[in-house]
Amino acid sequence: MLFRSGALQLLLMTQPHRKTVRLGIKKVFQDGRRRVFVWLKQFAQMQLGEKELTASPLGPPSALTPKPGRQRDPAKKLAGWNLAEAEETRELITALGRSGRPILIGPWLSEAGFELIYWIPFLAWAKAYGNLDPSQLVVISRGGAASWYRDITTNYEDVLSFYSPDEFRVRNEARIVEQHGRLKHVEICSFDREIIAKVSEKRGLSGVRLLHPSTMYRLFDHFWFQRVPITLIEAFTSFAALPPVDLGDLRGGLPERYVAAKFYSNTGLPDTPENQAFVASYLEELTRHIDVVLLNTPHRFDDHSDIAKANRGRIHTIDHLMTPANNLDVQSRVIAGAEAYVGTYGGFSYVAPLLGTNALTFYSHITGFRFDHLELAKRVFSGLRKGSFVELDVRSVDLIRLGFGALHDEFVAKG
C-alpha cells in the first residue's frame, strides 16, 4: 500500500514535466513531417521542370456549409466520416461499383420529403463515389417518380405498376408492423423482397446486387438522433436541382398562367374546421389575381387527405389526368410550369424549389414537424439558388398582409 501511494505521488509530481516532454516530442514530429513534405514538393517541382504545383480545382460549393455556397477545406475530414456505419457504407458502395452486376436501388416506399432531400442526394453521392455505371442501375420507387432520378439512371420501375393503390397501402402498412411500428425503411422486409423478385423477373435479371434505403437510414440516424452534426449529411450527399421537366401534352388543359396548390392534412396542418376555413378563404382570395390548379390526387396512398376542394371559376383540377403510376410525374410537371406553388408545409412541397418554382407553405401546429429536416431543406434550397421556400404559420398571415399594407383601409376606418 505504501509503495502504491508513493508511486501515485511520484506520478502527480512529474505530471507537468511529462506533459512538457510529450508536447516537445509532438512538436519535433510535426516539424519533421512538415520538412519532409516541403522537400517532397521541391523534389516534385524539380522533376516537373520547376513548374509551380497547383491544387486540383475545388468541387461545387456545398449547400450545407454555415454560409451556403462556401467551399469546405478539402483537406479536412467532416464529423461523422469515421463512424462504423460510414466505413461500412463506403465499403458497400465500393463493392457495388466493382461487382459488374445489375444493382437494384430501393425500393423506396415512404414519404416524398425524405426521398427528395436525403435519398436521391445520397444516391448521387454513391454514384460518384463508387463510379457506378448508370446502365447497371435500376431505381425502384412509386407513383411516377422516374424524372426525379434521371440524373442517377433512366432505368426505373414503379411499384404501383405491380400493385393497386389499396394493395400497396395494405402491404406498406404490414411492412411498418414488421418493423415494429417504424415508418422509415430501416430493414429489408418481406414486401421489399417480393418487389425485388418482381422487378428482377420482369427485367430478366439474375445475380443482382441491392442498394437499399436501410443503408442510408442506419448512417443518417446518427444525425437525426443528434449524435453528430449536419456535416455527416454533407459528407454522404450530393445536392442538385431535380432534372427539368416540362408540361408537354398537359399544356393544352391548363391556364396560360397559374399557381399550383396542394393543401392536404398532416400533423402540421391537421384537418380542422379552422384550417378548412383558412384554406377556402385563402384560395378564394388568390383566385382574384390568378388561376389556381389543384394537385388533388384521386387515389389514396397513405394517411394524408386533401383539404382543398375544387369549387368554381378560376380553380382547376387535374385528377382526371393522374393514375397511380404517374401521379408524381404529372404533379411535378404542373409545378414546374407554375408561377408559384402554395400548400401545406410537408415533404412534398420540396418538389417546387428543387424544380425552380417558388413555394409558399403553411402550417398551424409548430409541434407537428421536425425543425432539423426543415433547416436542412432550407439550407439546400438557399445553396442551390433555384426556387425560394417560405413556411408560414397560418396565424401570421394577417401580420404579413399588414406588413404589405393590405389592411391599411381597415385601420383607417377604425381610427
State where each predicted segment sits:
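Short, small-residue-biased leader/transition segments that mark boundaries at the very start
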Residues: 1-2
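Acidic donor-binding loop of glycosyltransferase active sites
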Residues: 336-342
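Active-site and donor-binding regions of nucleotide-sugar-utilizing enzymes
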Residues: 86-95, 100-204, 330-333, 348-351, ...
